[in-house]
From Swiss-Prot:
Represses a number of genes involved in the response to DNA damage (SOS response), including recA and lexA. In the presence of single-stranded DNA, RecA interacts with LexA causing an autocatalytic cleavage which disrupts the DNA-binding part of LexA, leading to derepression of the SOS regulon and eventually DNA repair. Keywords: Autocatalytic cleavage, DNA damage, DNA repair, DNA replication, DNA-binding, Hydrolase, Repressor, SOS response, Transcription, Transcription regulation. Residues 28-48 bind DNA. This is LexA repressor. It catalyses: Hydrolysis of Ala-|-Gly bond in repressor LexA. The keyword Nucleotide-binding does not apply. One of its GO terms (molecular function) is serine-type endopeptidase activity. Its EC number is 3.4.21.88. The keyword Disulfide bond does not apply. One of its GO terms (biological process) is proteolysis.
Length: 207
């Protein structure tokens, strides 16, 4: 491959680092901020030269579609370990959350994002009751299976009406308050509930 200028090397290393740590490439603006270039056209020019020299491949129809043509990085990403996290389609009272009949699919979650947890499941969020916690309608919450919770934890709970809900948990004097993170909604007050797990992460597709 053709030798790179110092600036091109900086840009390439930044892209590699972002892909390695986040799993996707940076935007043109992020590249410019990282290497001290205020002009997006200048960044585009460097990216074009990196592409012509065989270091990257770009898709002009997509803003972040930068592929690193680097065998070492490719091999490292290919060998990255993943765990198969069950994606729960429904929650049935009296059954384990990961009962076979509840599982719709499996999601390949990189181990480095699982934070050492093994007993995980994912559940699609429906509605806007947790928007102020950054959990939106259509998101998938990543949940660690556990049967207890501390006040303030965001949990998946089964209510007395056998409905699963994602709310913030508070055990109070003679009841449990399942608090939405939406100022327009009222809390759910129950005498008891079953904790299915604690939310530890969120997965979202960006359209």
């Amino acid at each position: 491959m053709t030798k790179l200028s110092k600036r091109q090397q900086q840009i390439l290393e930044f892209i590699k680092q972002e892909v390695k740590t986040k799993g996707y490439p940076p935007s043109v603006r992020e590249i410019g901020e990282a290497v001290g270039l205020a002009s997006s056209s200048t960044v585009h020019g460097h990216l074009a030269r990196l592409e012509s020299k065989g270091y990257i491949r770009r898709d002009p129809t997509k803003p972040r579609a930068i592929e690193i043509l680097d065998s070492d990085l490719t091999k490292e990403r290919e060998k990255e370990e993943v765990i198969s996290v069950p994606m729960i389609g429904k929650v049935t009272a009296g059954q384990p959350i990961t009962a076979v009949e509840n599982i719709e699919d499996y999601f390949p979650l990189p181990k480095r994002l699982a934070a050492g947890e093994k007993q995980l499941f994912m559940l699609e969020v429906m509605g806007d009751s947790m928007i102020e916690a950054g959990i939106l309608d259509g998101d998938y919450v990543i949940v660690r299976q556990q049967s207890s919770a501390n006040n303030g934890d965001i949990v998946v709970a089964m209510t007395e009406e056998n409905e699963a809900t994602v709310k913030r948990f508070f055990k109070e004097k003679d009841h449990i308050r399942l608090q939405p993170e939406n100022v327009h909604l009222e809390p759910i007050i129950v005498r008891d509930c079953t904790i299915l797990g604690k939310v530890i992460g969120v997965y979202r597709l960006i359209n």
